[in-house]
């Protein structure tokens, strides 16, 4: 098995890590940074930009710059809040209510999986360059509270990126691996994971190589983005009140406001007060308008109080599900950049009675844990057992619109469970199996994962046929369901597909499309390298020419200068074949003239014919 990497595919930033010399370490990306913004953009020239380079141009290209896409992955249109869709780029839905992201630059729509795949592809390419060997396999983390559709969609993103996803693991579980790798004594830890778009709490028993998840709870619609949005709305409302102009309808202003809000939020984690400067945010007939707004930490915390309070419920629920009191928790591990907010840290301390452990980097700990899991699969790390759980209950619809649970939440995975059902009416020869995920008693309150039909049931009185329904969850948390009629042995099975409904053909088409952009990106980078080499060659040649003495004929010098001029003109065009030919011509001419200069210098040296003393 080749090198397997661990990837934290985050809402705001992503990180890739690998085992090196027996220890997990974060991989530096092509820009020399340890984290990569989860941002993808397409320029008006149809060029693909990913990461930091995409983030830098967001203000001038807001409608074609896509961020926080993880909030949409594996979700239907009706499952996304109105607030989450308040973005500089446009989010719509297709005829099946699947989320689509509009890209005016290419005049086409993307699925969230396709956008996420471009981030994954960059991480894999950076890992390949850094490690000096091709990387094609990865362990990818997801929020613990991701449902089956969201997990399947993440797997699809990996396929589109050309990555073999060996394992999907929960982010808090990955963080616990990183924290507890060298722990010998048993500890009960609470992982509080507040990222850019999702929130998870997991409680685990850690020690002596065993990592057992006791419970998990969370909110997949709560994260740092929501704190940013509160500030954006505050700025929009304040500006509207003062100037009677609604900045919410201006996509460029909205992008600038979003960036300024994030910057202010980050600053207020270390200082008590900051000022938001946004010159020339818009203009009307009276002239340009500016924003210069002071923001204190107290005001920020008051604005975000409702969000901070939402963090309370999953902590209490997780403790209750694990049948533990806060006194039973030995350590609190903070994960995600949003846990740097002082009010969040204060909440955690008040709920648990303990100061959070600060020994791990909240931005990198999940990727480090994913790398450890990758190392386990690749045989680089041994003697570790990971016992994860399913975050939500799974079941089927039964008579009267009731959800009958087959696998309860917080059940250790992998797991297989069966229940017996029967027909509802006389002489019924088929049954519809409607698969659900959630905690509500009625079907309407839960997420529908899909359905299938079992035909060939012998005609009989209601309640007579015996239909065995088996739910099977694998180590990735992906669900398969099988229904079997006991008398005839007839059966039907289905692996639940993600809400994106991407079939194999669609995934293959998206992979080809993604590879096309990756190939174009590679060619573009190679061409830039050629131009840089050409400039360096011209510089060296000019330096050499200036050192020539009268022993080199003037026509030879002039030829070099002409070749340099031709190359500089070719650099301004995109004719790279011509440029390469001219570079070779200059190299040959320089070799000839340097050899000639050396011969002439030797011939004119009065000491050259003397023997060594």
UniProtKB/Swiss-Prot annotation:
Q: Name one GO molecular function term.
A: ATP-dependent protein folding chaperone
Annotated keywords: ATP-binding, Chaperone, Chloroplast, Nucleotide-binding, Plastid
Report the locations given in the UniProt record.
Plastid, Chloroplast
Q: Which SUPFAM superfamilies match?
A: Actin-like ATPase domain, Heat shock protein 70kD (HSP70), peptide-binding domain
Asked if the Swiss-Prot or TrEMBL record annotates the protein with the keyword Protein transport, the reply is no
Can you cite an annotated GO cellular component? chloroplast
Membrane spanning residue stretches:
none
Top-level lineage group: Eukaryota
Q: Which InterPro entries match?
A: ATPase_NBD, Chaperone_DnaK, Heat_shock_70_CS, HSP70_C_sf, HSP70_peptide-bd_sf, Hsp_70_fam
The function of this protein is: Acts as a chaperone.
Q: Which family does it belong to?
A: Belongs to the heat shock protein 70 family.
Show the HAMAP family listed in the entry.
Answer: DnaK
The name of this protein is Chaperone protein dnaK
Gene encoding it? Answer: dnaK
């Amino acid at each position: 098995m080749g090198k397997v990497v661990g990837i934290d595919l985050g809402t705001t930033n992503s990180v890739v890590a690998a085992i090196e010399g027996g220890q997990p370490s974060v991989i530096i990306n092509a820009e020399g940074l340890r984290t990569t913004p989860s941002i993808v953009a397409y320029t008006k020239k149809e060029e693909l930009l990913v990461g930091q380079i995409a983030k830098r141009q967001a203000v001038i290209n807001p409608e074609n710059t896509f961020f926080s896409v993880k909030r949409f992955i594996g979700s239907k249109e009706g499952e996304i809040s109105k607030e989450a869709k308040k973005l500089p780029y446009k989010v719509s839905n297709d005829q099946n209510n699947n989320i689509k992201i509009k890209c005016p630059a290419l005049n086409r729509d993307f699925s969230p999986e396709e956008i996420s795949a471009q981030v994954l592809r960059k991480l894999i390419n950076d890992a390949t360059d850094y490690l000096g060997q091709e990387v094609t396999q990865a362990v990818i983390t997801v929020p613990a509270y991701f449902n089956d559709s969201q997990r399947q969609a993440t797997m699809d993103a990996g396929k589109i990126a050309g990555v073999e996803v060996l394992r999907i693991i929960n982010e808090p579980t990955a963080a616990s691996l990183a924290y507890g790798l060298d722990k010998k004594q048993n500890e009960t830890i609470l992982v509080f994971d507040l990222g850019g778009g999702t929130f998870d709490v997991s409680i685990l028993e850690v020690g002596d190589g065993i990592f057992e998840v006791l419970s998990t709870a969370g909110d997949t619609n709560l994260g740092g983005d929501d704190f940013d949005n509160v500030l954006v709305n505050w700025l929009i409302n304040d500006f509207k009140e003062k100037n009677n102009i609604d900045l919410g309808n201006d996509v460029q202003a909205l992008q600038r406001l979003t960036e300024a809000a994030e910057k202010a939020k980050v600053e207020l984690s270390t200082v008590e007060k900051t000022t938001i400067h946004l010159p020339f945010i818009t203009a009307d007939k009276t002239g340009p308008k500016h924003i210069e707004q002071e923001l204190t930490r107290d005001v920020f915390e008051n604005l975000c109080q409702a969000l901070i309070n939402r963090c309370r419920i999953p902590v209490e629920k997780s403790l209750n599900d694990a049948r533990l009191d806060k006194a039973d928790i030995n350590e609190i591990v903070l994960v995600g950049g949003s846990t740097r907010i002082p009010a969040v840290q204060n909440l955690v301390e008040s709920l648990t009675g303990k100061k959070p452990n600060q020994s791990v980097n909240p931005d990198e700990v999940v990727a480090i844990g994913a790398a450890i899991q990758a190392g386990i699969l690749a045989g680089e790390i041994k003697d570790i057992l990971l016992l994860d759980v399913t975050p939500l209950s799974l079941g089927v619809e039964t008579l009267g619109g009731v959800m009958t649970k087959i696998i309860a939440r917080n059940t250790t995975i992998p797991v297989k469970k069966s229940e017996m059902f029967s027909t509802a009416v006389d002489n019924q020869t088929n049954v519809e199996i409607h698969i659900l995920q959630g905690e509500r008693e009625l079907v309407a309150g839960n997420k529908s994962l899909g359905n299938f039909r079992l035909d060939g049931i012998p005609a009989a009185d209601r309640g007579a046929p015996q239909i065995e329904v088996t739910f099977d969850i694998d180590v990735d948390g992906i669900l398969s369901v099988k229904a079997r009629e006991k008398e005839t042995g007839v059966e039907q099975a289905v692996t639940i597909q993600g809400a994106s409904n991407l079939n194999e053909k669609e995934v293959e088409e998206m992979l080809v499309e993604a590879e096309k952009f990756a190939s174009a990106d590679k060619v573009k980078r190679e061409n830039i390298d050629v131009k840089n080499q050409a400039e360096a060659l011209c510089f060296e040649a000019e330096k050499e020419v200036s050192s020539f003495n009268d022993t080199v004929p003037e026509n030879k010098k002039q030829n070099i200068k002409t070749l340099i001029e031709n190359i500089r003109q070719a650099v301004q065009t995109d004719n790279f074949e011509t440029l390469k030919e001219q570079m070779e011509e200059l190299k040959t001419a320089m070799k000839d003239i340097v050899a000639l200069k050396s011969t002439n210098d030797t011939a004119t040296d009065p000491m050259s014919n003397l023997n060594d003393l």
